[in-house]
């Protein structure tokens, strides 16, 4: 008798739990924008059910004392390829960096921290210029 009462008491709980398991999960959310100059122009958006990752691309080109940044962020079904960072210097006093990141949790394609993004590039460039000037003066 005790078993019957225990079974009857736990049955509604099991049915309620089974109902929760069938509720659809929310889609991934990512920041989304295309070739903008500021992360504030990248609003968050819900991805389609097929999208599994967030992608972030940042192109930074430094010309002497100015910096040009282009950001693109979006949802995607998979990563196009691994995370990468490509640097090049097409001319003296011109430096470029392309950074691509792929991640799979909500709003993970945020803006880069100052250590990761354009300020690090500008700081590195200023340090190189400063050291060159110091060598020239000595």
From Swiss-Prot:
A lipid is attached at residue 117 (GPI-anchor amidated glycine). The lineage of its organism: Eukaryota, Metazoa, Chordata, Craniata, Vertebrata. It comes from Homo sapiens (Human). Disulfide bonds join 30-47, 103-108. Glycans are attached at residue 27. This is Lymphocyte antigen 6L. Residues 1-16 form the signal peptide. Residues 28-122 form the UPAR/Ly6 domain. Residues 118-138 form a propeptide. It is a lipid-anchor; GPI-anchor. Keywords: Cell membrane, Disulfide bond, Glycoprotein, GPI-anchor, Lipoprotein, Membrane, Signal. InterPro entries: LY6_UPA_recep-like, LY6H/LY6L_nAChR_modulators, Snake_toxin-like_sf. It is found in: Cell membrane. One of its GO terms (cellular component) is plasma membrane. The keyword Metal-binding does not apply.
């Amino acid at each position: 008798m005790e078993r019957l009462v225990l079974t009857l008491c736990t049955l509604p709980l099991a049915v309620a739990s089974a109902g929760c398991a069938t509720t659809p999960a929310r889609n991934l959310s990512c920041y989304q924008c295309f070739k903008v100059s500021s992360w504030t122009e990248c609003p968050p958006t819900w991805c389609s059910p097929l999208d599994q990752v967030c992608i972030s691309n940042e192109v930074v080109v430094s010309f002497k004392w100015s910096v040009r940044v282009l950001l693109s962020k979006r949802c995607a079904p998979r990563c196009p390829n691994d995370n990468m960072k490509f640097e090049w210097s097409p001319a003296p006093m011109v430096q470029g960096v392309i950074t691509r990141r792929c991640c799979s949790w909500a709003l993970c394609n945020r803006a880069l921290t100052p250590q990761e993004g354009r300020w690090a590039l500008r700081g590195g460039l200023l340090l190189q210029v400063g050291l060159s000037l110091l060598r020239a003066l000595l």
